[in-house]
């Protein structure tokens, strides 16, 4: 009888201990349930553009269409020769069909013009020879000396290899986010838990500045939420 009472007391004591352990675990879980930190991770690179599209527009004006057409062809040939002399290939050069404007055909046009027709065309260079294009742009004044009227000249630079940089930059952004979260956890007397949510990451490509559009600034920002533990 005495042994039965001792056994019952022991079982009750064990039950109380287990109950206390479960209660403590539940309280700890409840306390940690809503503890989290959301941080951003940043990765940046500066890289040279690896693709450029350069458009050069030229025009001639006058009253004799056949002569104007010949004059436009002459200017186009001079531009193409200039481009090839600066290291660009025929396959990288495209000449658009000429565009003709008849000023007399415009109802709102002025009648005191010294010429009737404007014939224009655009020569486009698409290449990965960024350095050669940059040099040619600085030398395009040579075309003016040859009598070529450049109406407009615009170069658009790109970084086409961006997709290859994404994994490396994303990994760096995540690493930086984790580092920030660990610093926050340490300052809060907590330890960093698992990732609760993670953003895909926002990628941006911009010119480094307005004077060097051929230098690109790559930027990726990721947002991650970590749990915190006591």
Predicted features and spans:
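Short, charged, surface-exposed interaction patches
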Residues: 2-9, 15-230
């Amino acid at each position: 009888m005495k042994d039965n009472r001792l056994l019952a007391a022991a079982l009750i004591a064990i039950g109380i201990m287990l109950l206390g352990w479960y209660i403590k675990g539940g309280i700890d879980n409840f306390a940690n349930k809503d503890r989290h930190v959301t941080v951003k991770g940043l990765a940046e690179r500066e890289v040279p553009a690896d693709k450029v599209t350069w458009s050069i527009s030229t025009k001639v004006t006058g009253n004799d269409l056949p002569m104007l057409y010949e004059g436009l062809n002459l200017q186009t040939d001079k531009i193409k020769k200039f481009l090839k002399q600066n290291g660009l290939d025929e396959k990288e050069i495209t000449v658009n069909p000429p565009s003709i404007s008849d000023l007399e055909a415009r109802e709102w046009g002025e009648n005191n013009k010294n010429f009737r027709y404007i014939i224009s065309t655009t020569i486009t260079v698409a290449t990965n020879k960024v350095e050669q294009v940059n040099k040619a742009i600085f030398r395009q004044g040579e075309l003016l000396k040859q009598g070529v009227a450049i109406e407009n000249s615009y170069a658009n630079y790109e970084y086409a290899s961006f997709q290859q940089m994404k994994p490396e930059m994303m990994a760096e952004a995540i690493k930086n986010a984790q580092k920030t979260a660990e610093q926050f956890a340490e300052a809060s007397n907590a330890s960093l838990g698992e990732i609760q949510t993670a953003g895909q990451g926002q990628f941006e490509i911009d010119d480094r500045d307005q004077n060097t559009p051929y230098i690109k600034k790559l930027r990726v920002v990721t947002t991650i939420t970590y749990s915190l533990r006591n």
